Protein backbone atom coordinates (compact mmCIF):
# COMPACT_ATOMS: atom_id res chain seq x y z
CA UNK A 1 0.00 0.00 0.00
CA UNK A 2 1.22 3.48 -0.82
CA UNK A 3 1.68 5.55 2.30
CA UNK A 4 -1.03 8.12 1.40
CA UNK A 5 -3.49 5.35 0.56
CA UNK A 6 -2.55 3.57 3.77
CA UNK A 7 -3.24 6.67 5.88
CA UNK A 8 -6.57 7.19 4.11
CA UNK A 9 -7.60 3.55 4.66
CA UNK A 10 -6.51 3.58 8.30
CA UNK A 11 -8.61 6.70 8.88
CA UNK A 12 -11.63 5.20 7.10
CA UNK A 13 -11.37 1.90 9.00
CA UNK A 14 -10.98 3.71 12.32
CA UNK A 15 -14.08 5.82 11.62
CA UNK A 16 -16.08 2.69 10.72
CA UNK A 17 -15.01 0.53 13.65
CA UNK A 18 -13.71 2.81 16.39
CA UNK A 19 -10.67 0.53 16.72
CA UNK A 20 -7.25 1.83 17.76
CA UNK A 21 -4.97 3.17 14.99
CA UNK A 22 -2.38 0.40 15.48
CA UNK A 23 -5.13 -2.25 15.29
CA UNK A 24 -6.46 -0.67 12.08
CA UNK A 25 -2.96 -0.71 10.55
CA UNK A 26 -2.49 -4.35 11.51
CA UNK A 27 -5.91 -5.29 10.10
CA UNK A 28 -5.11 -3.60 6.78
CA UNK A 29 -1.73 -5.35 6.62
CA UNK A 30 -3.35 -8.74 7.25
CA UNK A 31 -6.09 -8.07 4.67
CA UNK A 32 -3.67 -6.55 2.10
CA UNK A 33 -5.61 -3.29 2.02
CA UNK A 34 -9.11 -4.81 1.65
CA UNK A 35 -11.17 -2.69 4.04
CA UNK A 36 -14.09 -5.16 4.28
CA UNK A 37 -11.73 -8.00 5.15
CA UNK A 38 -9.92 -5.72 7.60
CA UNK A 39 -13.23 -4.96 9.30
CA UNK A 40 -13.99 -8.71 9.58
CA UNK A 41 -10.52 -9.33 11.03
CA UNK A 42 -11.03 -6.58 13.63
CA UNK A 43 -14.40 -8.06 14.55
CA UNK A 44 -12.83 -11.49 15.11
CA UNK A 45 -10.04 -9.93 17.18
CA UNK A 46 -12.66 -8.09 19.22
CA UNK A 47 -14.53 -11.31 19.95
CA UNK A 48 -11.26 -13.00 20.99
CA UNK A 49 -10.34 -10.10 23.28
CA UNK A 50 -13.85 -10.03 24.72
CA UNK A 51 -13.63 -13.72 25.60
CA UNK A 52 -10.34 -13.13 27.43
CA UNK A 53 -11.84 -10.27 29.43
CA UNK A 54 -15.26 -11.86 30.08
CA UNK A 55 -14.27 -13.25 33.49
CA UNK A 56 -13.21 -9.87 34.86
CA UNK A 57 -15.46 -8.24 37.46
CA UNK A 58 -17.48 -5.22 36.34
CA UNK A 59 -18.42 -3.23 39.48
CA UNK A 60 -18.64 0.17 37.74
CA UNK A 61 -20.82 1.49 34.94
CA UNK A 62 -23.85 3.61 34.17
CA UNK A 63 -27.61 3.42 34.07
CA UNK A 64 -28.67 4.89 30.74
CA UNK A 65 -32.16 6.10 29.94
CA UNK A 66 -33.95 6.73 26.68
CA UNK A 67 -37.37 8.20 25.99
CA UNK A 68 -38.61 7.60 22.46
CA UNK A 69 -40.07 10.47 20.43
CA UNK A 70 -43.67 11.03 21.48
CA UNK A 71 -42.98 10.03 25.08
CA UNK A 72 -44.73 6.66 24.61
CA UNK A 73 -41.74 4.35 25.19
CA UNK A 74 -39.06 4.58 27.89
CA UNK A 75 -36.02 2.43 28.68
CA UNK A 76 -33.60 2.05 31.59
CA UNK A 77 -30.53 -0.14 31.11
CA UNK A 78 -27.58 -0.91 33.39
CA UNK A 79 -24.28 -1.35 31.56
CA UNK A 80 -21.23 -2.29 33.65
CA UNK A 81 -17.48 -1.98 33.17
CA UNK A 82 -14.39 -2.52 35.30
CA UNK A 83 -13.39 1.03 36.27
CA UNK A 84 -15.01 4.36 37.05
CA UNK A 85 -12.60 5.98 34.58
CA UNK A 86 -14.06 4.02 31.65
CA UNK A 87 -17.62 4.53 32.92
CA UNK A 88 -17.12 8.28 32.49
CA UNK A 89 -15.76 8.13 28.92
CA UNK A 90 -17.92 9.32 26.00
CA UNK A 91 -17.36 6.00 24.18
CA UNK A 92 -18.81 3.97 27.06
CA UNK A 93 -21.71 6.36 27.64
CA UNK A 94 -22.52 6.30 23.92
CA UNK A 95 -22.56 2.49 23.99
CA UNK A 96 -25.02 2.51 26.89
CA UNK A 97 -27.23 4.98 25.00
CA UNK A 98 -27.08 2.83 21.84
CA UNK A 99 -28.16 -0.23 23.85
CA UNK A 100 -31.05 1.75 25.35
CA UNK A 101 -32.18 2.83 21.86
CA UNK A 102 -31.93 -0.80 20.70
CA UNK A 103 -34.23 -1.90 23.53
CA UNK A 104 -36.75 0.82 22.70
CA UNK A 105 -36.76 -0.07 19.00
CA UNK A 106 -36.58 -3.88 19.09
CA UNK A 107 -38.51 -4.76 22.29
CA UNK A 108 -36.36 -7.65 23.57
CA UNK A 109 -37.91 -9.75 26.33
CA UNK A 110 -34.67 -11.29 27.60
CA UNK A 111 -31.01 -10.32 27.83
CA UNK A 112 -29.58 -13.49 26.23
CA UNK A 113 -30.77 -16.91 25.12
CA UNK A 114 -29.49 -18.36 28.40
CA UNK A 115 -32.07 -16.21 30.20
CA UNK A 116 -35.09 -17.66 28.40
CA UNK A 117 -36.95 -19.98 30.81
CA UNK A 118 -37.33 -23.56 29.56
CA UNK A 119 -41.11 -23.32 29.83
CA UNK A 120 -41.13 -20.29 27.51
CA UNK A 121 -39.10 -22.18 24.89
CA UNK A 122 -41.30 -25.25 25.27
CA UNK A 123 -44.45 -23.15 24.87
CA UNK A 124 -43.06 -21.41 21.78
CA UNK A 125 -42.00 -24.74 20.28
CA UNK A 126 -45.52 -26.08 20.81
CA UNK A 127 -47.06 -23.01 19.16
CA UNK A 128 -44.78 -23.47 16.15
CA UNK A 129 -45.65 -27.17 15.86
CA UNK A 130 -49.38 -26.34 16.05
CA UNK A 131 -49.00 -23.74 13.30
CA UNK A 132 -47.26 -26.27 11.05
CA UNK A 133 -49.87 -29.04 11.21
CA UNK A 134 -50.16 -30.75 7.84
CA UNK A 135 -46.57 -30.02 6.79
CA UNK A 136 -44.26 -32.73 5.50
CA UNK A 137 -42.92 -34.54 8.58
CA UNK A 138 -39.45 -34.87 7.06
CA UNK A 139 -39.09 -31.08 7.02
CA UNK A 140 -40.93 -30.45 10.27
CA UNK A 141 -37.99 -30.66 12.70
CA UNK A 142 -35.86 -28.36 10.54
CA UNK A 143 -38.63 -25.76 10.15
CA UNK A 144 -39.44 -25.86 13.88
CA UNK A 145 -35.77 -25.31 14.74
CA UNK A 146 -35.46 -22.43 12.25
CA UNK A 147 -38.56 -20.71 13.64
CA UNK A 148 -37.38 -21.28 17.21
CA UNK A 149 -34.01 -19.73 16.36
CA UNK A 150 -35.81 -16.70 14.92
CA UNK A 151 -37.85 -16.41 18.13
CA UNK A 152 -34.62 -16.47 20.17
CA UNK A 153 -33.00 -13.78 17.99
CA UNK A 154 -36.10 -11.57 18.14
CA UNK A 155 -36.54 -12.03 21.90
CA UNK A 156 -32.96 -11.66 23.18
CA UNK A 157 -31.17 -8.32 23.27
CA UNK A 158 -27.66 -9.68 22.71
CA UNK A 159 -28.72 -11.84 19.76
CA UNK A 160 -30.66 -9.09 17.94
CA UNK A 161 -29.23 -7.36 14.85
CA UNK A 162 -28.01 -3.92 15.92
CA UNK A 163 -30.57 -1.34 14.76
CA UNK A 164 -27.87 1.05 13.46
CA UNK A 165 -25.93 -1.66 11.61
CA UNK A 166 -27.87 -4.83 10.77
CA UNK A 167 -24.68 -6.64 9.73
CA UNK A 168 -23.71 -7.11 13.40
CA UNK A 169 -25.54 -8.20 16.55
CA UNK A 170 -25.70 -6.28 19.81
CA UNK A 171 -23.28 -8.88 21.20
CA UNK A 172 -20.85 -8.06 18.35
CA UNK A 173 -21.18 -4.35 19.13
CA UNK A 174 -20.27 -4.94 22.78
CA UNK A 175 -17.31 -7.13 21.75
CA UNK A 176 -16.07 -4.32 19.50
CA UNK A 177 -16.24 -1.84 22.37
CA UNK A 178 -14.46 -4.27 24.73
CA UNK A 179 -11.62 -4.49 22.19
CA UNK A 180 -11.61 -0.73 21.72
CA UNK A 181 -11.74 0.21 25.42
CA UNK A 182 -9.72 -2.70 26.82
CA UNK A 183 -12.13 -3.56 29.65
CA UNK A 184 -14.87 -6.10 30.12
CA UNK A 185 -18.34 -4.68 29.47
CA UNK A 186 -21.58 -6.33 30.59
CA UNK A 187 -25.20 -5.39 30.00
CA UNK A 188 -26.57 -6.30 33.42
CA UNK A 189 -30.32 -5.68 33.16
CA UNK A 190 -32.92 -3.53 31.49
CA UNK A 191 -36.55 -2.54 31.67
CA UNK A 192 -38.74 -1.21 28.85
CA UNK A 193 -41.95 0.70 29.46
CA UNK A 194 -44.63 1.32 26.85
CA UNK A 195 -47.56 3.61 27.56
CA UNK A 196 -50.73 1.64 28.23
CA UNK A 197 -49.17 -1.84 28.23
CA UNK A 198 -50.63 -4.43 30.63
CA UNK A 199 -53.59 -2.18 31.44
CA UNK A 200 -56.80 -4.15 31.59
CA UNK A 201 -60.07 -2.58 30.48
From Swiss-Prot:
Q: Give a yes or no for keyword Nucleotide-binding in this entry.
A: no
Region annotation (Involved in Mg(2+) ion dislocation from EF-Tu) maps to 83-86
Q: Which keywords appear in this protein's UniProt record, sorted alphabetically? A: Cytoplasm, Elongation factor, Protein biosynthesis
List the record's Gene Ontology CC terms alphabetically.
cytoplasm
Pfam family, any one: EF_TS
Q: Where in the cell is it found?
A: Cytoplasm
Q: What would you give as a GO molecular function for this chain, any one?
A: translation elongation factor activity
Gene3D superfamilies, per this entry? Answer: 1.10.286.20, DNA helicase RuvA subunit, C-terminal domain, Elongation factor Ts, dimerisation domain
The keyword Oxidoreductase is annotated on this UniProt entry: no
Q: Which PANTHER family match?
A: ELONGATION FACTOR TS (PTHR11741), ELONGATION FACTOR TS, MITOCHONDRIAL (PTHR11741:SF0)
Name the family. Answer: Belongs to the EF-Ts family.
- Functional summary from the UniProt entry: Associates with the EF-Tu.GDP complex and induces the exchange of GDP to GTP. It remains bound to the aminoacyl-tRNA.EF-Tu.GTP complex up to the GTP hydrolysis stage on the ribosome.
UniProt-listed HAMAP family: EF_Ts
The name on file for this protein is: Elongation factor Ts
